Amino acid sequence: PIPISHPNQGRGYRFEEEGRSFVFLTDNELTYRHPGGLEYEDYQTFAENADLLVHDAEYLPEDYLLTRTWGHSVYTDAVRLALDAGVARLGLFHHNQDRTDEAVDGMVDDCRRIAAGRPLECFALHQDMEIAL
């Protein structure tokens, strides 16, 4: 486990089996270091070359002006982490409950635009979703 950057603290996890890896980092604010949290580079190293990264992507950049220090990330920061860590697939997670499905789809489209030309698959997680590694 790895400490996450959140006011209530917590842990992120990396699971590896049969040559596949899954990293789970929810409630993790990448651009603000809460007590007990780590530096961006530590999360990058933890997620390095993962087959799947599930990361907190609650906010839009404009939301973050009002929510900085709340313990959640802007979706574009999650994409940057996935790209910097060489992750194969990024699942956006912990969507803002006020965000419409269409708005989440727009976030995914933007993630794909940001990652264009690089080997990163972006998608939004939803309730009851199952993912094969």
Predicted segments, located by residue:
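Metal-dependent phosphodiesterase/nuclease catalytic metal-binding core
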Residues: 1-93, 104-110
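Short, solvent-exposed polar/charged micro-motifs at secondary-structure junctions
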Residues: 10, 131-133
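Conserved short loop/turn motifs at secondary-structure junctions
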Residues: 96
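Short acidic, glycine/proline-enriched helix-loop-strand junctions
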Residues: 99-129
